Swiss-Prot record:
EC top class, as a word: oxidoreductase
InterPro entries in alphabetical order: Ald_DH/histidinol_DH, Ald_DH_C, Ald_DH_N, Aldehyde_DH_dom, G-glutamylP_reductase_CS, Glu-5-SA_DH, GPR_dom
GO annotation, biological process: L-proline biosynthetic process
Recorded metabolic or biological pathway in which this protein acts: Amino-acid biosynthesis; L-proline biosynthesis; L-glutamate 5-semialdehyde from L-glutamate: step 2/2
Major localization listed first in the record, in broad terms: cytoplasm
Protein name, entry field: Gamma-glutamyl phosphate reductase
Annotated keywords: Amino-acid biosynthesis, Cytoplasm, NADP, Oxidoreductase, Proline biosynthesis
Regions that span the bilayer: none
Function per UniProt: Catalyzes the NADPH-dependent reduction of L-glutamate 5-phosphate into L-glutamate 5-semialdehyde and phosphate. The product spontaneously undergoes cyclization to form 1-pyrroline-5-carboxylate.
Subcellular location: Cytoplasm
GO cellular component: cytoplasm
Organism of provenance: Xylella fastidiosa (strain Temecula1 / ATCC 700964)
Length: 425
């Protein structure tokens, strides 16, 4: 048995124990995990500093450094997030259907854990803690395979969380961190369909494509966020600028940050100069089509690749469109089914925008930054699914469970042949 198969088998065995834990036991475990992060803060931050030094040596971009970096405030927020997850309602055991059929059988649909979830991700060490906590809260085992750029941070975080499992007299193999960064090890992991029930890739386009193409396990992709804001002709200009600043500048490296601004031609002469002036203090680089460059001479001319880009940086692509249909067509062509925003005072246009786009989250007169599990009332999220399966959009605890039927009867049979069978003649 290979090493990675052995680890997955151990996680599978541990997951059976997690699936039987009471809500109170899981709450205490997650609170202990949060305390372990606080206790190991110095060790975790030192490991993260080493990761950051290595990343700077390799001259990675500012967006990657931001996703990788931890500080005392971010680490404290990670621990607080675990306490918040501990306090969330437990989805396991929830009855989603309760029915009695005419023949007397009692039918229920009940949420149960998925089993073992593999999380493959890049850069963000907070995902190590968040994903582990969410999966364990939902009664699942978790196999984590982070990126090489965060390996020291991830080991330090996982070590703290595994110690909490031991303190709770639970197998630490309920949480596995794969430390072998070789591509062939990840490839082997993706073949273990008999031991792993779901794989969630979260990272760059190359990683997600690799996982989707090679996995023999069901995959829920957390694809790139090419998010748009369309400013309709009837839009309130002040509102549109406020949403634009929030969506682009507050955390440009987030997957729910705006990447492209679409503007109706009727409002463009009034809106775009004001929007450009509002964005200037934040250092946002603007790239626009020819019509935009006519209104804003300092703007760089956008290429086709700009409209498909997830910048994760202070760069914004702009296009002026003649109508709502043109905006929808642009989003269908370049979007990633993540999050789209319309700013409009026309209810019919808002309804058309919502109905015509397949994106996981559609906002009407609200910031793209609300495309987040906490902001949408899920309490926490493991990511934002762009795969149209049972989980689409921000994935909370419910998305880490499945529903199964439990049927209780008093000896009912569907067909009733003679019993014992009549003797053959």
């Amino acid at each position: 048995m290979s090493h990675i198969r052995h680890l997955a088998q151990q996680c599978r065995d541990a997951a059976r124990i997690l699936a039987t834990l009471s809500t109170d036991a899981k709450r205490r475990l997650l609170e202990t995990m949060a305390t372990a992060l606080n206790t190991d803060a110095a060790t975790i931050l030192a490991a993260n500093a080493a990761d950051l030094d290595a990343a700077r040596t390799q001259q990675v971009g500012t967006a990657m450094l931001d996703r990788l970096a931890l500080d005392p405030q971010r680490l404290a927020a990670m621990a607080d997030a675990l306490r918040d997850i501990a306090a969330l309602p437990d989805p396991v055991g929830q009855v989603t259907r309760d029915d009695r059929r005419p023949n007397g059988i009692h039918i229920q649909k009940i949420r149960v854990p998925l089993g073992v979830i593999a999380m493959i991700y890049e850069a963000r060490p907070n995902v190590t803690a968040d994903a582990a906590a969410l999966c364990i809260k939902a009664g699942n085992g978790i196999i984590l395979r982070g990126g090489s750029e965060a390996i020291r941070s991830n080991i330090a975080i996982a070590t703290a969380l595994q110690r909490a499992l031991r303190l709770a007299s639970l197998p630490e193999t309920a949480l596995i961190l794969v430390q072998d960064m070789a591509r062939h090890t990840m490839l082997e992991l993706l073949q273990l369909s008999d031991l792993i029930d779901l794989v969630i890739p979260r990272g760059g386009e190359g990683l997600i494509r690799f996982v989707a193409e090679h996995a023999r396990i069901p995959v829920i992709k957390h694809y790139k966020g090419v998010c748009h804001q369309f400013v309709d002709a009837s839009a309130d200009i002040e509102m549109a600028i406020r949403l634009l600043i929030d969506g682009k500048t507050t955390r440009p490296a987030a997957c729910n940050a705006l990447e492209t601004l679409l503007v109706h031609t009727d409002i463009a002469p009034r809106f775009l100069p004001a929007a450009a002036a509002a964005l200037r203090p934040y250092g946002v680089q603007l790239r626009g089509d020819h019509a935009t460059c006519t209104l804003l001479p300092d703007v760089l001319l956008a290429t086709d690749a700009d409209y498909a880009a997830e910048y994760l940086d202070l760069i914004l692509a702009i296009r002026i469109v003649p109508n709502l249909d043109a905006a929808l067509e642009h989003i269908r062509r370049y979007g990633s089914d993540h999050t789209e925003v319309i700013v409009t005072a026309d209810p019919a246009h808002a309804d058309t925008f919502v109905q015509q786009l397949p994106s996981a989250v559609v906002m009407v007169n609200a910031s793209s930054r609300f495309s987040d599990g906490g902001a949408l009332g899920l309490g926490a999220e493991i990511g934002i699914s762009t795969t149209r399966l049972h989980a689409y959009g921000p994935m909370g605890l419910d998305a880490l469970t499945v529903e199964r039927f439990v049927v209780r009867g008093q000896g009912q049979v569907r067909h009733c042949p003679p019993y014992p069978p009549a003797p053959r003649r």
